[in-house]
Amino acid sequence: MYRKKTLLLKRSLGVAVFLSVIALGVWMFQFTFFSPSHQAKSAVKEFYTLEQEGNFSESWDLFHSSMKKKWTKGAYIQDRAHVFLNHFGVDTFTYSIEGVEKRKSWKMENDRKAFPGVYEMTVIQTYKGKYGNFDLVQKVYAVREKGEWKVVWDYKQ
């Protein structure tokens, strides 16, 4: 009888440990992939992947509405293609995203209202073109707009 109780207790403990490990794994997965910082970084990554492919039309769609006021979609597409592809003499670039940090608030321009709950990161684009190899280093911000993370650049003087 004692042996059966011990065996039952060991099995119950094993099941409890197994379920705890599963629950912890699910929580870590959710925290990692559904956290605001991960989602913000994913939006910036998607933007620069589209830019890398020369798909400036779709990358423009990932801008915050305040960025879209700076250029029409057509002007953005033409300007990006002209500067990067023609002037730099490159077909594409590589990039990395570093240092995702949450900021309580941040302003795109000095005379603008601050965005709350912004994520700041550094994007390093590496070009290998007719003028040699060079890096373009830029602070990039992810801002929530209508439930989606959107890309914003810094225009403060």
Model-derived features with residue positions:
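Extracytoplasmic/periplasmic, Sec-exported soluble proteins
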Residues: 36-39, 48-55, 68-72, 111-113, ...
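Broad hydrophobic/π-residue packing in well-ordered secondary structure
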Residues: 47, 56, 60, 140, ...
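Short, low-complexity N-terminal intrinsically disordered segments enriched in polar/charged residues
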Residues: 2-53
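Short solvent-exposed beta->alpha transition segments
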Residues: 57-116
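Low-complexity, intrinsically disordered short segments enriched for Gly/Pro and polybasic residues
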Residues: 42, 48, 88, 131-132
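Second-shell loop/turn segments in exported
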Residues: 31-34, 62-67, 127-128
